Amino acid sequence: MEILIIVIAAVVGLALGFAIAKMLEKKQASGTIASAKKEAGSILKEAKAEGESIKKDKILQAKEKFIELKSEHEKVILSRDKKINDAEKRIKDKESHVSNELGKNKKLNKDLEEKVADYDHRLDFLEKKQEDIDKLHNSKVQQLEVISGLSAEDAKAQLIESLKDTAKADAMSIIQDTVEEAKLTAQQEARKIIINTIQRIGTEEAIENCVSVFNLESDDVKGRIIGREGRNIRALEAATGVEIIVDDTPEAIILSCFDSVRREVARLSLHKLVTDGRIHPARIEEVVKKTRKQIEEEIIDIGKRTVIDLGIHGLQPELIKMVGRMKYRSSYGQNLLQHSREVAKLCGVMAAELGLNPKLAKRAGLLHDIGKVPETETEVPHAILGMQWAEKHGEKPEVCNAIGAHHDEIEMNSLLSPIVQVCDAISGARPGARRQVLDSYIQRLKDLEEIAFGFGGVKKAYAIQAGRELRVIVESEKVSDEKASNLSFEISQKIQTDMTYPGQVKITVIRETRAVNVAK
């Protein structure tokens, strides 16, 4: 029973609490609604005020935009009206100009028609005059034919033939005079150019280049160079390919070899060995190997210095090396580099005298004998071989042709070719240039003259042109014209039989007859 009362009391308490809570909630909600209504009224009032303000601003902006668009539209209309007015004005001006031009053209056409009519009248008059002249001409021609007894065609043919013969005679006379003058002038100019060229070049005589002499401080060094049982000298000869001659010559050893490079390698190697003091086969091989490398470097330096001295640029490295190697080559005993430098200078001077390119001429002169550089023999002539190398290394066609044609192996098609040929002959043919020291050169000239004096009737004999020509003056009483021809042949045969000489010897026999009388 007590439990039931407690449960009922609890239920009643809960119901009462719930009712009180509901009453409190309703009271609170009514207060909130009133507040919200008040706040909503305030917001609505503010929104209306702001909307009126925005509406006024938009209306004002729309008015301003309308005014702006109206102003721009008026400007466009004004501009368009101006363009239309300008176009109308230009059209009116053109119409006026066209009208003026039409008026002028009408006037010109009228003047032209009048001139054409006048010219037609004149042409008719001239044609009539021409007919009268033709009739008169034919009449005169007929009268002349009757008087001369020749027709007009025959007279014309005779006149043409006479004029032709006269013109031929005059032309032949002019041609002969021109040819003679050209020959004389050409010879004089050629002599002048060659003489000027030679005078401006200083040259040296050739040197003997088959042996070199290595000087020693004392004869005691000779034994060390020879070595025990000659092993050092044999090792040196085997390493260099040079014959080493040790004789009784005091303080000197002779190095003999046709190859200048080998001889120079041997000389420098000996100098290093003697200076160092260590002379034995192993050391000899080491020094010779280093010396060969040094010589190769010197060859390149010599080539570079040579082309710089001559003012030649753009030469390929392989050609520069060939130029340097020329120092250790010889041609008929003449040092090849000295000869090529000399020819290059001669070519430069001669080309300048003739108004040609001196630099190109120097280039051709320097390279003209590069075909003689290789150590091994070849079946190709050195001029052709040099031309092939020059072509291979990009030299100009004029230079290549000058190299290949300087001994007439190919046809000359460049003005440089005869210049190189002439300068090569000048350098090689002068006294003492090639292997013949002055004494042997003079002796050969004397022998030529002695052979001429060995024949009867010879009055005088002169060896000239560096021994390339022998002029023989004979006594006219003893030698007739027929015998003079036979004498030159006999002298040439005698020279061929008894003498050794380079090139050719020209024999010229001169017979002179003089008749002298005295008027008293």
Curated annotation (Swiss-Prot):
EC number, as in UniProt: 3.1.-.-
Record keywords, A-Z: Cell membrane, Endonuclease, Hydrolase, Membrane, Nuclease, RNA-binding, Transmembrane, Transmembrane helix
Any one of the GO CC terms: plasma membrane
Pfam families: HD (PF01966), KH_1 (PF00013), RNase_Y_N (PF12072)
GO biological process: mRNA catabolic process
Domain of life, per lineage: Bacteria
Main function: Endoribonuclease that initiates mRNA decay.
Family: Belongs to the RNase Y family.
Protein name in the entry: Ribonuclease Y
Source organism of this protein record: Christiangramia forsetii (strain DSM 17595 / CGMCC 1.15422 / KT0803)
